[in-house]
Amino acid sequence: MACDEEKPKCRSCTRRATPCTYTNSVGLNHLAKAAQASSPYSKPEPGSGFPPVPYNHDGFVLNGNNAVQANSPLPLAPPSPLALNMPHLELLHHFIAVTSEVLGVETISRQVWKSTIPQIALSHDFLMHSILAVAALHIAHLRPEQRRSYWERTAMHQDRALELQQEAMANASRDNADALFSFSLLVVYYAFASPKVSGSQEAEEPLAGAIQCISIIRGMRYLLPPIRQWVEEGPLAQLLSIHPGNMKSNHSFKDHDTELYFQRFLVLCSTSSDMNKTHEFEDIEQCAAAASTLRASFLTAESVADGGLKAPPIWHWACRLAPEFLQRLGKLHPIPLVLVAHWCVILAQVRQYWWIQGWVDHTMGQIQKTLPREYHEWLDWPMKKVQEQRENWSREGERIGSS
């Protein structure tokens, strides 16, 4: 069955859990259409209530003084060197003043997002477009009454960022290594936040959002090695210092019951009758490896909490998954679904951040509806832990509010 080239993601490829040849390599969902490079004007849908916004051919919004009427036969005049692009300045200011404070989970990371990365973006258009896209996405999240307008700007900047990043990645070097690394992080935040902000979350096929996020996180695994040495020698080296691979973890859980639970869980993932029926022994190995890596991520998260960091390494597990695991997840096989439900426990520890708000509950709900009933007992532990974290955050909020 051929790719039907349907956006945001073709249904044929989704049903077969195969990579879509029509989407770009990052595979992001975009509900809004990209601005047409051949036209200086965006074209909102009829009846949307939003007037057309003038763009130049690089995808940047033009100052109103340089706009040309839509029915004008004259070509778009180049903007004056003195013209200020207020829409871009608005987004950049918001990113530096507001968004940067709610991206990084550590003080060291927040300072990098606030100062270092915007400075790097001044020399790399693809990173600047990505920054503006995430800023617009954040504003759309904060201002529901203006969500449509800012989502259109989000999609336009993200499309342009992806286009320019492909060329930069093909020519990776010391000069653009930090920009590529920063971009890869922004794309992950974008992937988690965009379905809810755009309104596509309820319309997507089961687990489509989770599969997309995992796929993008896995992409970092291939992007980083060629540029890692340059990043380690540059201003973003401190971000690599908090990578899970650089953190020590315990060999077993402090809580004996948790240790016993994960021992049973590893047995389930290694001997599932569902997989034995199909004799797909390679898949059994992949799920067993995924379960073992997930246990290691929980141990690292427990050790990080003891060390005083405010959030666990939430992407470590997804980054190490094999492509075969994603294929089984796309087919909604039980063991991958149960594993993602357990990953949600780690993600729930950062649920206060805007870019992941609602993601855990939505994904857990989809898994509960999709998972065969005989496996539902394996949702009890992750659902209990997510509920405990929800109650802890609620109590913490009440404590702060009363202080």
Over which residues does each language-model region extend?
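N-terminal cysteine-rich, zinc-dependent DNA-binding domains of eukaryotic transcription factors
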Residues: 1-27, 120
